[in-house]
Amino acid sequence: MGERGLGWAGLWVCAAMLLAGGAQAAGKCERLVATGNPEYPPYLWRDPQNPEKLIGATVDLLKAVAEDLGVGIEVIYAGPWSRAQEEVRTGRVDMLAGAFLTVPRLETMDFVHPAFLSTPSVVWVRKGREFPYASWADLQGRTGDTLVNNSFGQAFDAYARDNLTLEGVSSLSQAFQKLLLERTDYVLYERYPGQ
């Protein structure tokens, strides 16, 4: 399926042009607000003690870099992955952690790269309902799920749009529940966050 190379750590999908332009016009940038996929452990997830915040390895990295730059950062829960993307696209949030680089996303966001992490995307299936998988074509004729507005790279996204029945759901738990209930044949998601 490929690696989420520029994806997860295109990690600093940042409205950098906005930041650069705003910093020059309004003075030094002193605080950033970031968000991301709240179902992405060990990288990002909602803090059970404070559900309005995200925690994880990505938050630790963002805070360390922000501290080195002398900028404050707050990493908030802005809703499911699709809403988090919309919050950045509309400028209500400054930075999006964990987006895969695609041409449509480049129209509204700048990506800082190279990525600091690659995480493999995999095809999850129900035990006892396995099927041979060697290429994208093996997914044809089956129904799959992933998160709304999730991307696995521009080439796969185009292939899926033209050849696959791939539905979007709002949460990973919903995708896996549909898989367990045999309402879908597979789930596309990254290996470590999906475990």
Where are the regions a protein language model picked out?
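Ligand-binding cleft/hinge of the Venus flytrap
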Residues: W45-N50, L62-V71, P114-F116, W136-Q140, ...
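N-terminal secretory signal peptides that target proteins for export/translocation
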Residues: M1-L6
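Short, hydrophobic alpha-helical packing/hinge segments within bilobed ligand-binding/sensory domains
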Residues: L61-L62, R83-E87, A175-K178, T184, ...
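Flexible hinge/capping segments at coil-to-helix
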Residues: V125-G144
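Extracytoplasmic small-molecule ligand-binding "clamshell" domains
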Residues: A26-F100, E107-T108, G168-V169
